């Protein structure tokens, strides 16, 4: 237990020299912001609801990167870590993986827009993608209120050639890395590429979700709605039925998505 000393300067009159009072406190007595002002404890508790046997080495590596991101002092890092964590946990929740078609469509339409300057296709792809994200948030809540049924559930799927495994990975990450100087993104790129090249469909889905999430316009949506996603993960981490928090997060995500301009 580290002692903390509080120094008080008190003047008895306008012209008197101040007297000094030193009070010693335990660091446990000092009031703190919720979650120490960081999101790392929130996402750590939410991760506890995912069976470790469902996590590959690559996913465990991503988990550690996101915990480090969530421990940073800037809001952007914490928001990104929270949103990515929610998506990954959701994809690990269903017993039978869905597909990554919505994410792949967002990625391909964005990289096409970067090359052509026409982002009409990208704007059209956002609705299905964020609808997919909203469905996934329901899966996170099921980890608390009905985990047994999740074993036999199927993740959200739109249906497309290859199940969303085929998209312009390198061009997408060129845009992602060019948009930020965060060292965490360089680490993520290496690990997400392993997930992308995996033969496991669940790993492929997670790679597509992370890649789509980090595209600059999509990341901005999650940046604006991160508070509601944090509340959801906090509720899940505390073992509460978070049905209302799911609806709140879905509403904020939809609102932020409607404001995307490219």
Curated annotation (Swiss-Prot):
Silk fibroin elementary unit consists in a disulfide-linked heavy and light chain and a p25 glycoprotein in molar ratios of 6:6:1. This results in a complex of approximately 2.3 MDa. GO terms for cellular component: extracellular region. This is Fibroin light chain. Disulfide bonds join 101-160. Its main location: secreted. Keywords: Acetylation, Disulfide bond, Secreted, Signal, Silk protein. It is found in: Secreted. The interchain disulfide bridge is essential for the intracellular transport and secretion of fibroin. Residues 1-16 form the signal peptide. Produced exclusively in the posterior (PSG) section of silk glands, which are essentially modified salivary glands. It comes from Bombyx mori.
């Amino acid at each position: 237990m580290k002692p903390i000393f509080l120094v008080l300067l008190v003047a008895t009159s306008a012209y008197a020299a101040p007297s000094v009072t030193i009070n010693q406190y335990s660091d446990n007595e000092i009031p703190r912001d919720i979650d120490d002002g960081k999101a790392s404890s929130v996402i750590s508790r939410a991760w506890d609801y995912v069976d470790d046997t469902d996590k590959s080495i690559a996913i465990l590596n991503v988990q550690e990167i996101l915990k480090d991101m969530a421990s940073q002092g800037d809001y952007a890092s914490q928001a990104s870590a929270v949103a990515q964590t929610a998506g990954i946990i959701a994809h690990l929740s269903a017993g039978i993986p869905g597909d990554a078609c919505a994410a792949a469509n967002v990625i391909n339409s964005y990289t096409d827009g970067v090359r052509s300057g026409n982002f009409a296709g990208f704007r059209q792809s956002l609705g299905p993608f964020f609808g997919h994200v909203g469905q996934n948030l329901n899966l996170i809540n099921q980890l608390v209120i009905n985990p047994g049924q999740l074993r036999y559930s199927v993740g959200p799927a739109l249906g497309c050639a290859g199940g969303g495994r085929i998209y312009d990975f390198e061009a997408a990450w060129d845009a992602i890395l060019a948009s930020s100087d965060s060292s965490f993104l360089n680490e993520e790129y290496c690990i997400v590429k392993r997930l992308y090249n995996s033969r496991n469909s669940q790993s492929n889905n997670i790679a597509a979700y992370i890649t789509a999430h980090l595209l600059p316009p999509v990341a901005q949506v999650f940046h604006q709605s991160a508070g509601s996603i944090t509340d959801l993960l906090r509720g899940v981490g505390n073992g509460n039925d978070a049905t209302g928090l799911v609806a709140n997060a879905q509403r904020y995500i939809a609102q932020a998505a409607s404001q995307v301009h490219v």
